[in-house]
Amino acid sequence: MLILVSVVLKNKLGFIFTAFSLFALGFYMASSSNLKINIKNPVFLECKVISFPEKYYKNFLSDCKVLNSNNKNLINKEVKLISNKKLFFLSNVYILGKASIKHNKIFVKVVNLKEEKNKFLSPILSFRDYLIKNFKENSLNYISFSIGNALIFGDRSYIPQNIKKAFINTGLIHLLAISGLHIGLLIFILLFIFSFWDKRKSYLITILFLIFYPVITAFHIPVFRASLMGILYLYGKFKYLAINPMNILFFVAFISALIYPEVIFSVGFQLSFIAVFGLILSRKYIEIDIKNKFLKFFITSMLLSFFAVLWTTPLIIFYFHQFSPTSIFATTFEMFLLIPYLFLSVLNMFSLFLIKPLINIMDFIGLKFIELAKLFDSLKIMASNLDLNLIEVLTYYILLGFITINSKIKIIYKYILFFILFSFLFVMSKI
């Protein structure tokens, strides 16, 4: 229905309806899909590893696309391999194991396996392992290594559960996942580091870094997506082209879905996409003209957090049934630690994590980053047992989009309407 409406409407409003139509499909599929497969053990699998290994209790967990199996129901399915061995990304593996279904996902406990490593990627991934090894050896302690492993290499599996819980309770868990925010900060940092050269050279070096960075961060789809957006944006700058961020966003979403069609059903993809989509639509409310750079940074960060929360909260309630208003102001304060941390992480990457004092300064900031999250968690500001249905979510987004793009409404009245709409969201979620 929404798709038909979007054809009739024109310009931005039709554009918004098209986006929400796609999300409606993703919401429906993500919330209603129920895996039903008859599995007989043991299973024999030939599959391709499509993720980097993550720590899973005393073993490692890897995603794998099944190419062939004695159980025909598993062919072309994605399974999670539990193994005591780290499997290389894009390796072909032959497995004997025991399969089970948990949380609507297929898990295979590996009994025996043979691995054929990808000849092209193997040396690159070995270099990634070399950097992680150097970082671990020179890090202050396990906690500082675990936070760095998440913020630099994209692996949150080493972070202790109590620390993860503090970030979840405060709505700051997105800061532990490398996403558009981190890539944006890295672009800013790299352009600053190479600002002594002319702009075109600094753009080119940053593009080369963004091409390589997804390998360092385990080819996580959010990193690939954000890096591709950054590359296209910088390439436009390099070639003096007119840049439309919305076009770049939808092009990258299309490429992501083309490479990995299931991504449209991913909650992470939906949250990331709607956040960037909302920030692009709301950017005229975020860009403020203040001469004091510190004050401008602080207010801009608060506005970014506010609009990101405004656009993502319905999805968070829809999927997780909880919300922490702490994230609106907590994100801003954490940014004051995240920026120097990422700045030092770039220097450490260039020095191959061999300069211990430089790593330890970064570790110190990382530990303060955790302490601040725990401080906000101690405030215990959390709304739980919330519930929204798909119609309510879509109605909210249509109204929010209409208020945002309507040029006839004065800005002060828009903020009042934003507040009323946001408050109404919680009234609906409690009914």
Task: Please annotate each region the language model reported.
Residues 88-91, 267:
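Short, flexible surface segments
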Residues 18-21, 205-212, 249-253, 414-424:
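Central hydrophobic cores of alpha-helical transmembrane segments
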Residues 1-37, 95, 105-111, 123, ...:
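N-terminal leader/targeting segments
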Residues 70-89:
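Beta-strand/loop nucleic-acid-binding surfaces
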